[in-house]
Amino acid sequence: MADTACLALRLLAALREEEARAVEELLRLGADPNLVLDDGAAAVHLAARASHPRALHCLRMLLRWGADPNARSAEGLTPVHVAAAWGCCGALELLLSRGGDPTLRDQDGLRPLDWALQQRHHNCARVLQELDTPTQPDETREPTETFHVAQGSFETETCQGPALAESSGVSQDSELHVHRAELEVEAVEVAVHPQSSEATENSDYSSDASFVTAVEDSLQPGRPGGALELVAGLWVTRGAVSAGKGAPNCQPQVLTLTARDTDKPVLPGDGDLGALHPHSSVPPMSDLQLLQALRALGYSPGPVTPFTRGHYLRRLQEAQASRADVGHSQELAEALRTGTIPDCQVDEEALAQCFQRLDPLKKWREGITKSSFTYLLLDPRLTKDLPARASSLTLAECLQCFVRAIFYVGKGTRARPDAHLWEAFGYHDQPRKQVCPKVRRILDIWASGRGIISLHCFQHVVAMEAYTREACLLDALGLQTLTNQKQGHYYGVVAHWPPSRRRRLGVHLLQRALLVFLAEGERELRPQDIQARG
């Protein structure tokens, strides 16, 4: 662990000096760019402040070596937050192009756009606001031809000759070649508008090949409409070389696609991406709404661009068509369908272990007193006294009923165990006041004559552990199915796990909470119960 922290500290020092060679060497030695250090941030957060070419090169290198553009600092900040807050538009565009999520909020509930507006970085704000701009409906767009490009690299080939130079306006000394360039986007669709028939008729071709040139494109701050420019840009020229004596025969094999670490030029995961603008039942939505809808279904999409929008729309349509219980994560949907719970006991032990012996001399969120817990609010109108009925139901049926009744997940303390109910009690006799969705649901249950089921789980832990367990449960359940208004915060080792692993742990924790509920029985809290306690 000491060696890991030492490497991470040396990586921070190299980034401050913008020494690209030292950064690369440390990454080769195993330095973790996502490791949150004592100051509460990781190397990728420091690199997100890149504002000129050398610093951007270091950031690009970190991302290439596995830096997470959505890694959380101790305060819940992601590199996208940092770039927006510092006004580093080039870094912001780069992070977004590598999967940075502009919808994530920090521990204060602020998005990257909120930071950009607060700090008056209008160029960054413009980039982020474009993500929430409704796009043109599919029916109004011109038909396109699409090329499907897999993650991989272009092999260099050369085709040169006098006839080519004469027909294209390129000097005889130049070469038409394809640079070897990494494509860092998982799946890209390149739309090519066909030439007009008039242009076709007036041209004499000796070959009908299309030439694709991949050019390394450095991201430029303030580029118009450049909110999500790709690092490896693709320029596509539809056309061919004029015939002439001695003209070389440039065949289509000039372009060779080679997928990384494989012999087949296939897309990772999906294969064919489908049409760029599929005709579907999905209603018109902005790019941000599309991102949020996919995240609610348990996906972790990258940025929505003109290249990827069609793919994400199709994925959303398929998910909505195939899943009756839209909103839950894939992992929870599988558990609800089969009753099979992921075996994550080892992961839960790892989560708890990292909070067992915290250094009391360091500053931790809400201290190190083990007085916190995670709680679930349930609607008794949906549980229908599940503990009494459980013996006649299967595990899958019990879990389905339990999950359907959960409407809020939170973190509480022994000092204020029912703070959420006290909040709702303050509005009990004032129905006309505007309230949040959680309070509205509580008041609705009380108005029906029933009480709230407040299930306390995973008790006697430090606040950061309770927050982490809460975040796992939220990701497994999906915000769309709850009255929670923001994602949770991860701390410790879980902060560095992939989203799918966190969601599996969330399903495991849900099943443990269900067992607590079945053992304790169903108890309702009505307004008079809250008043009596007060």
UniProtKB/Swiss-Prot annotation:
- Kindly give the PROSITE patterns that the UniProt entry links to this protein: ANK_REP_REGION (PS50297), ANK_REPEAT (PS50088), GIY_YIG (PS50164), LEM (PS50954)
Keywords, in A-Z order = ANK repeat, Cytoplasm, DNA damage, DNA repair, Endonuclease, Hydrolase, Nuclease, Nucleus, Repeat
Cite the EC number.
Answer: 3.1.-.-
Q: Which GO terms describe its cellular component?
A: cytosol; nucleoplasm
Q: What happens when the gene is disrupted?
A: No visible phenotype. No defect in T cell, B cell and erythrocyte development. Normal percentage of common myeloid precursors (CMP) and common lymphoid precursors (CLP) in the bone marrow.
Q: What class of enzyme is it?
A: hydrolase
Where does the record say this protein resides? Cytoplasm; Nucleus
- In Gene Ontology terms, what is a biological process of this protein? protein export from nucleus
Q: Where is this motif: Nuclear localization signal?
A: 498-505
Q: Where is the LEM domain?
A: 279-323
Where the record annotates domain GIY-YIG, the positions are 370-485
ANK repeats mapped onto the chain: 4-35, 39-71, 75-104, 108-137
**GO terms for molecular function, please?**
endonuclease activity
Q: In which tissues is it expressed?
A: Predominantly expressed in bone marrow, spleen, thymus, colon and ovary. Expressed also to a lesser extent in lymph nodes, liver and testis.
Q: What does this protein do?
A: Endonuclease that probably plays a role in the DNA damage response and DNA repair.
Free-text domain note: The LEM domain is required for GIY-YIG domain-mediated DNA cleavage and induction of DNA damage response.
**Summary of subunit composition and partner proteins:** Interacts (via LEM domain) with BANF1; the interaction may favor BANF1 dimerization.
This chain's protein is named Ankyrin repeat and LEM domain-containing protein 1
Q: Which organism is it from?
A: Mus musculus
* Taxonomic placement: Eukaryota, Metazoa, Chordata, Craniata, Vertebrata
